[in-house]
Amino acid sequence: MFSRVLALLAVLLLSANTWAAIEINNHQARNMDDVQSLGVIYINHNFATESEARQALNEETDAQGATYYHVILMREPGSNGNMHASADIYR
């Protein structure tokens, strides 16, 4: 019984990751004809690393119901620790 529950949890966790948004590069963004642009998202938070900022963009993309995102800006403008990130999102 315990192994069945464990197996079910593993399947659910793996399937949840397959629904995550996919980051695409410049070339892919220009050549995707079968997607609909949903606009641009902006995030200004105190992140320790660029990967944390990318994770936040991914989560916001998911929250907006988009499938793909293309990072258009990621920078730390001053010494205040806030990282500014923005991305085009697509469905």
UniProtKB/Swiss-Prot annotation:
What's any one GO cellular component for it?
Answer: periplasmic space
Keyword Signal tagged: yes
Report the transmembrane regions from the record: none
The record's keywords, sorted A to Z, are: Periplasm, Signal
Endpoints of the signal sequence = 1-20
Q: Which SUPFAM superfamilies match?
A: YdgH-like (SSF159871)
Instruction: State its location(s).
Output: Periplasm
Look up keyword Acetylation and say if it applies.
no
Q: Name one GO biological process term.
A: response to stress
- Tell me one Pfam family matched here: YdgH_BhsA-like
Q: Which PANTHER family match?
A: OUTER MEMBRANE PROTEIN (PTHR34156:SF6), OUTER MEMBRANE PROTEIN-RELATED-RELATED (PTHR34156)
What does the similarity note say?
A: Belongs to the BhsA/McbA family.
> What is the protein's given name?
Uncharacterized protein YjfY
